[in-house]
């Protein structure tokens, strides 16, 4: 049978699920570059895991026999080795200021696990008799399990960033143990007999259930991030009440910004969305910096927040005064008096730094 179609399915279907999960990151706090970097970590984890699993099999086979050793590796050794190797880069990257919260961790972990699964799918296709059945079965079961298990580690790593003392390490260990437990249970299921009938349905259920769990965790994280934005988006960082209210209604943004496209053109609509996304990212970085306990991490987050603030001011100038006034009229703050509203608009039409000269630049440019 031609291997091209099964191989394509083995790679593209997991990639499609990764894209689905990635699209849940409303504020795009995790860059696509970092997603690709974590995928490279997942790709590199496969040959490392293969060497370690093979070594464990050869050692165990001397005392247990080949069949028992193979089962032990699949159900005990491999889940430990693969979960540690898949998410090692994610755990390392979590110490960098680019990593904001566990929403990033879930997406980065899912990316690493998905890349690992892609290579593993291709490896198993080289040994399969029915290539199409092997490919389809794996992309809806094993591949999704790999991504979801690694996402659990990413969530734990993201929460551990803001823990203190032993709680940080406890969170990380619990995340890895949870991933290993999911992986072990799945491998025990699929190695208990032929992959058909009820067992196949259960395996697919575990895979799809893992994706649903990952999406639920991301939505939980987005809910917490929305709370962060309510606390951090204020005049102290150059964000008006109206702009803050609009950012917090991000799910409705396409509808809310549609009149801008109609009145000012599609280019201004894109610029407005970019401006509001930068505000959201600034709010998240500001809150993360406030929560960070390590001085180096705190300094890195504050530096990123300062850079985002400059980009936000540039984006505000690109949007222009008249369009900004329209944006602020979309979601008026509750309870503002006329004078409060006027004061807010006079203050917030200016960049966060250099207000007088920023206003002149806006008017001239």
Where do the language-model regions lie?
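Hydrophobic alpha-helical segments at protein termini of multi-pass membrane proteins
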Residues: 1-365
């Amino acid at each position: 049978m031609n291997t091209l179609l099964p191989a394509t399915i083995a790679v593209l279907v997991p990639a499609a699920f990764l894209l689905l999960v990635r699209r849940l990151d409303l504020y795009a706090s995790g860059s696509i570059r970092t997603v690709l970097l974590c995928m490279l970590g997942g790709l590199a984890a496969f040959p490392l895991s293969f060497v370690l699993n093979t070594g464990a099999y050869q050692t165990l086979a001397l005392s247990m026999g080949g069949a028992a050793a193979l089962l032990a590796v699949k159900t005990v050794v491999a889940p430990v080795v693969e979960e540690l190797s898949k998410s090692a880069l994610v755990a390392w990257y979590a110490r960098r200021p680019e990593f904001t919260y566990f929403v990033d961790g879930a997406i980065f972990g899912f990316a690493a696990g998905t890349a690992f699964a892609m290579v593993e799918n291709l490896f198993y296709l080289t040994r399969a008799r029915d290539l199409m059945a092997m490919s389809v079965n794996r992309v809806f079961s094993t591949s999704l399990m790999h991504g979801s298990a690694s996402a659990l580690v990413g969530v734990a790593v993201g929460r551990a960033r803001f823990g203190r003392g032993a709680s940080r390490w406890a969170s990380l260990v619990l995340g890895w143990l949870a991933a290993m437990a999911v992986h072990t249970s799945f491998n025990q299921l699929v190695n208990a007999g032929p992959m058909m009938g009820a067992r196949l349905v259960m395996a697919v259920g575990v895979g799809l259930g893992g994706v649903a769990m990952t999406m639920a965790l991301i939505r939980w994280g987005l809910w917490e991030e929305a709370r962060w934005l309510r606390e951090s988006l204020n005049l102290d960082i150059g964000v008006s009440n109206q702009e803050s209210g609009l950012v917090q209604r991000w799910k409705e943004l396409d509808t809310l910004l549609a009149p801008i496209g109609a009145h000012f053109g599609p280019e201004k609509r894109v610029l407005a969305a970019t401006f509001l996304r930068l505000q959201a990212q600034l709010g998240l970085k500001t809150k993360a910096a406030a929560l960070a306990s390590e001085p180096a991490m705190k300094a890195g987050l504050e530096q990123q927040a300062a850079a985002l603030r400059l980009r936000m001011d540039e984006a505000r100038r690109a949007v222009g005064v008249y369009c900004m006034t329209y944006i602020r009229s979309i979601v008026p703050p509750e309870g503002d008096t006329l004078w409060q509203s006027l004061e807010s608009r006079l203050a917030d039409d200016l960049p966060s730094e250099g207000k007088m000269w920023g206003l002149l630049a806006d008017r001239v440019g």
